[in-house]
């Protein structure tokens, strides 16, 4: 309720009244609303020639950002022949998920064209769907960000890092890369958020959210309440 009241047009002002135990009277603070932009992809070089890509959430521009970061790192490696790239590390630890088409697009970045990424199944006929590594399944308008992808992204050795905080879209990507033997999954068991939820309007101001289907990896494994088991179990050091 509080968040709903604070939302508004960018650059508009809002007064917040705060109550603190240490202050006898409420404090009024004026803040200016703005669009919050979260960078969902980061990258860097790890020691000994490994390109590291960290995805914190699957958002609208995550696929394009992933391609951009990959191309930049691989271009740097091609320019310095003394330090060839040996592999790719995709870090999905503590990534809670996000948009389904973004997960399909990120998977397509590393997989062969047209292979299955994820499928859904439920009681209703329209719940049975399959999503593949092709533009029609990950694009939501605009140009295809994978058009300019460095082809080495699909062939270099690859490791995916996961843990108990990797959920939903993260599990879709990890499961697809694991089933197609494109990458080795390393870490601990993922969260197990593999349900498809549909919002059904009841009145003008209310709705009900129901679980209508489940996600399945290309090999037919259910993600729900099971998660993705890594190929190599490695606990994180504190």
Q: What are these model-predicted stretches?
A:
Residues 29, 210-211, 220:
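Beta-strand scaffold of nucleotide-dependent catalytic cores
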Residues 102-103, 211, 216:
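Long, folded non-catalytic interaction modules
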Residues 202-213:
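Short acidic, Pro/Gly- and aromatic-enriched capping/linker segments at domain boundaries
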């Amino acid at each position: 309720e509080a968040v709903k009241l604070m939302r508004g047009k960018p650059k508009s002002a809002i007064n917040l009244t705060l109550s603190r135990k240490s202050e006898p009277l409420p404090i009024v603070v004026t803040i200016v609303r703005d669009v919050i932009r979260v960078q969902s992809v980061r990258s860097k070089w790890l020691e000994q020639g490994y390109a590291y890509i960290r995805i914190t959430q699957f958002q609208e521009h995550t696929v394009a950002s992933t391609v951009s970061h990959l191309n930049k790192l691989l271009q740097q490696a091609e320019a310095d022949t003394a330090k060839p790239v040996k592999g790719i590390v995709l870090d999905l630890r503590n990534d809670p998920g996000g948009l389904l088409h973004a997960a399909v697009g990120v998977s397509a970045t590393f997989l062969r064209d047209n292979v299955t990424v994820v499928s859904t199944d439920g009681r209703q006929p329209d719940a049975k769907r399959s999503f593949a590594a092709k533009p029609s399944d990950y694009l939501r308008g605009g140009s295809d960000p994978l058009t300019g992808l460095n082809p080495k992204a699909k062939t270099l050795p690859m490791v995916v890092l996961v843990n108990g905080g990797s959920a939903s879209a993260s599990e879709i990507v990890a499961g697809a890369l694991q089933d197609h033997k494109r990458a080795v999954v390393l870490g601990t068991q993922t969260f197990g958020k593999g349900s498809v939820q549909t919002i059904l309007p009841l009145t003008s101001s209310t709705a009900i959210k129901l679980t209508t289907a489940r996600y399945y990896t290309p090999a037919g494994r259910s993600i729900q309440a099971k998660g993705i088991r890594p190929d190599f179990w490695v606990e994180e050091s504190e």
